[in-house]
Regions:
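A cross-family phosphate/adenosyl-ligand binding-site feature
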Residues: 2-128, 134-174
Length: 174
């Protein structure tokens, strides 16, 4: 068992984890995270933004978690409940990964216009935001201000690692 797997076992075992996946190229990496969370005995529910489904298929997360992957606020094929509130109340922790500049800006300013942002804003659970984007976008003063706002509102923002990015650049953002 790796060090990260041991830590995950300690922190997420028997916890309800809400995993928000946004539309960045790093979306495919989140399947591994979902798998590790499930392996650590977390109950993982995934919400994907409209753009995220262009990078990875919801069936991947459904297979890994055993739960329907939520991709639409107005899904008409559901049991009667206010789904974003039910998921928000269920969550012991909310993770948004990869977090695009767009979704971080929405969360920093209280904009709730899709299933992910409405659910995150409705949840009282601790929130972990993992930005992933091009270095220029990440270092943009507007993005940095939004990150500071997210921290001010009590969200934990993980600093992205540095390396070779999908666009061919080397820098921070992966």
């Amino acid at each position: 068992m790796t060090n990260i797997e041991m830590r995950m076992n300690i922190y997420v075992k028997r916890k309800h984890v809400l995993l928000g996946v946004t539309g960045g190229i790093a979306s495919y990496k989140i399947a591994t995270l979902a798998s590790l969370l499930v392996k650590a005995q977390a109950d993982v529910h995934v919400i994907m933004t409209e753009n995220a489904v262009n990078f990875i298929n919801p069936i991947t997360f459904e297979t890994l978690t055993g739960h329907k992957c939520i991709t639409d606020t107005f899904d008409r094929n559901f049991e009667f409940k206010v789904e974003h509130i039910a998921l928000a109340q269920l969550a012991d922790v909310v993770m948004v990964a990869p977090a695009t500049a767009n979704v971080m800006a929405k969360l920093a300013h209280g904009l709730a216009d899709d299933m992910l942002t409405t659910t995150v804003l409705a949840s009282r659970a601790p929130k972990i935001i993992a930005p992933a984007m091009n270095t220029a976008m990440y270092e943009n003063p507007v993005t940095q201000d939004n990150i500071e706002l997210l921290k001010h509102y009590g969200m934990e923002v993980i600093t992205p690692s540095t390396g070779h990015l999908a666009c061919g650049d080397n820098g921070t953002g992966k």
